[in-house]
UniProtKB/Swiss-Prot annotation:
It holds the Pfam family YbeY. This is Endoribonuclease YbeY. Binds 1 zinc ion. Belongs to the endoribonuclease YbeY family. Zn(2+) binds at H105, H109, D115. Single strand-specific metallo-endoribonuclease involved in late-stage 70S ribosome quality control and in maturation of the 3' terminus of the 16S rRNA. Signal peptide: none annotated. PROSITE patterns: UPF0054. One of its GO terms (cellular component) is cytoplasm. Its EC number is 3.1.-.-. InterPro entries: MetalPrtase_cat_dom_sf_prd, YbeY, YbeY_CS.
Amino acid sequence: MSLELYNTTRRDIPEQKLMQVIEGVLGAEGLVIEDLTAVYCGNRLSRRINCEFLQHDYPTDTITFRYNDGEAVEGELYISLDIVAENAQRFNVSFTDELFRVTIHSALHLAGFEDTSVEERASMKDKEDHYLNCFCQEDSL
């Protein structure tokens, strides 16, 4: 198993806890990590990746790439801490809560969940809430 986490910003983030959350969500979905890289970055990198791979010329909260099928996950996820901070303010939640929600969201994409339709978004939101309650309670941080 290889899970590597990189923080390319100056913002402090709970790296060990984020790794535990990623492992926990994937494990609960019946998956294991084979080779996964999690990059917590700023808007510049997020925009570049979003433009290059999805042809969207703007930064986004998360971009997730799954490179294989099956139970052993190989992939990458990129999370913009700038967008996480903006969304935390917009939704009136803490930066940490939003960071965990977006990390869980990314892990769910790795597990095969989509969010293109209203129904899929609602299902993912329910799963995010469930995993936030499981792994991200204040006493477990």
